[in-house]
Swiss-Prot record:
Protein name: Probable cytosol aminopeptidase
SUPFAM superfamilies: Macro domain-like, Zn-dependent exopeptidases
Gene transcribed to yield this protein: pepA
MF terms (GO), sorted A to Z: manganese ion binding; metalloaminopeptidase activity
Database matches in PROSITE patterns: CYTOSOL_AP (PS00631)
Organism field: Nitrosococcus oceani (strain ATCC 19707 / BCRC 17464 / JCM 30415 / NCIMB 11848 / C-107)
Length: 501
């Protein structure tokens, strides 16, 4: 979709559809008031008659409104004025986009709720509009023989502002929104692909494709033989039950001088997880194709970073394999030697994500990182604790944790911090190795992070458990693209700090 910015009065705009917000309790947004005045109270009469209440997500399409040059006016319900949040506005705008798509409008114009928002609010609003529009129009069709037929796709959206001086701020928001939307859609596509297509080799090829598309990106893939020489024993043990060769995928972005320490993003790329010898129940096992959403999210973030040309150095590391049962697969009771030299007793082969991540975290040390952030669909315990709304966050550096929490709030891709206390480490004690790969039923998300913490003592590190936020089940089943918005916002914040320092 193409996005543009213009300024002027709403009633004088020639467009296929003009979108204005309406609050509950018969309250009109500032732009809706202008439309109401131009139409001699048409909108307010509709509301008083009960034809439109302004409830969140409600949409009403009006044709040939008197005194208004737009072909259609779409009233967008925004809920109670004093309770409008970014999440509520996303829901309202998503419903409006679907209404525009249904009516066959190929282009439309949308107004802010208020004529004179603060600078930061205007940029965030423009970004939200773009991200939500792209998300609402997303369709997965890669493995369908028949494509979904649409009347005419919504191809152009113009953001209408009160003053021309506001346009640069909105254009900045559009640029950020388009970059994030591209990254989110890439992560969703990769997550939604079935495991027989999106293999470790496919993920590696996707990294190579990104490197060809963006000159600022450089891809490097470690094959099994190279990993054996280096001693990535934990990652290789997980992959032994699969016929698909494992990969260690790196994608480097250089947007700053070489002396600037890189930010390293590590993403779990387990393209299918049957649990190995500790095999999972059959119910919903198909959703284990989503176990690579950490890796997909990291690749999507790298694309967004390249789109924005951020003045940072960022490196993605994606350990990728399958976890399947086979005569060669690792077994409960096996002891593995990781790249760090530490030994691990495997008590449950279905706790494999931490095994491929620990070698990737150790591998990240060679880049002398400023910070390392790993992203993984790691524990069912996180789904129980936080559900589908917040990702779990644990860190050995409180400043880093606070920056990520702030990025989550700004991007509406929120996280919730859990403790990483030494008290939990004893749950990983083993009589036969330096540690066990699980710590019992209690505090499963925390003990998984405690396991990873043993491989991150030499750098600042944060862990995002996205097991509850990476995909949806049920009627709306599919990958969400999270945490691309959170990670990209964190990188935007770091880039802004770099400019001012």
């Amino acid at each position: 979709m193409n996005f543009h910015v213009t300024s002027g009065t709403p009633e004088k705009q020639r467009t296929a559809a003009l979108v204005v917000g309406i609050y509950e309790d018969e309250k009109l947004s500032s732009y809706a008031q202008r439309i109401d005045k131009a139409s001699e109270g048409y909108v307010s009469r509709l509301i008083k008659q009960g034809d439109f209440t302004g409830k969140k997500g409600q949409a009403l399409l009006l044709f040939a409104l008197p005194g208004v040059k737009a072909e259609r006016v779409l009233l967008m319900g925004c809920g109670q004025k004093d309770k409008v949040t970014a999440k509520n506005l996303r829901q309202s705008w998503s419903g409006a986009v679907k209404a525009l798509q249904a009516c066959g409008a190929t282009e439309a114009m949308i107004c802010p709720l208020e004529a004179k928002p603060k600078d930061e609010e205007l940029t965030q609003w423009a970004r939200l509009i773009v991200e939500t529009a792209e998300q609402a129009l997303y369709r997965y069709e890669h493995t369908k023989s028949k494509k979904e037929s649409l009347k005419k796709p919504l191809a152009k959206l113009t953001l209408l502002l009160d003053q021309r001086s506001q346009q640069p701020l909105a254009e900045q928001g559009i640029q950020q929104g388009q970059a994030i939307a591209k990254g989110v859609n890439l992560a969703r596509d990769l997550g939604n692909l079935p495991g027989n297509i999106c293999t470790p080799t496919y993920l590696a090829d996707e990294a190579r494709r990104l490197a060809k598309e963006y000159k600022s990106l450089k891809a490097k893939i470690l094959e099994q033989a190279e990993m054996e020489k280096l001693g990535l024993g934990a990652l290789l043990a997980v992959s032994r039950g699969s016929r698909q060769p494992p990969k260690l995928i790196t994608l480097e972005y250089k947007g700053a001088p070489g002396k600037q320490k890189p930010i390293v993003l590590v993403g779990k790329g387990l393209t299918f997880d049957a649990g190995g010898i500790s095999i999972k129940p059959g119910e919903r096992m198909d959703e284990m194709k989503y176990d690579m959403c950490g890796g997909a999210g990291v690749l999507g973030t790298m694309q967004a970073c390249a789109e924005l040309e951020l003045p940072l150095n960022v490196i993605a590391v994606v350990p990728s394999s399958e976890n399947l049962p086979d005569g060669a697969a690792n077994k409960p009771g096996d002891v593995l030697t990781s790249l760090s030299g530490q030994t691990i007793e495997v008590l449950n082969t279905d706790a494999e994500g931490r095994l491929i991540l620990c070698d990737a975290l150790t591998y990240s040390k060679r880049y002398r990182p400023d910070v390392v952030i790993d992203v993984a669909t790691l524990t069912g315990a996180c789904v129980i604790a936080l559900g589908a709304h917040a990702s779990g966050l644990l860190s050995n550096d409180q400043s880093l944790a606070e920056h990520l929490l702030a990025a989550g709030q700004t991007s509406d891709d929120r996280a919730w911090q859990l403790p990483l206390w030494d008290d939990y480490q004893q749950q990983l004690d083993s009589n036969f190795a330096d540690m066990a790969n699980i710590g019992g039923r209690g505090a499963g998300t925390i003990t998984a992070a405690c396991f990873l913490a043993r491989f991150t003592e030499e750098f600042r590190w944060a862990h995002l458990d996205i097991a509850g936020t990476a995909w949806l089940s049920g009627k709306e089943k599919g990958a969400t693209g999270r945490p691309v918005p959170l990670l990209t916002q964190y990188l935007i914040q770091r880039a802004q700090e770099a400019k001012t320092s």
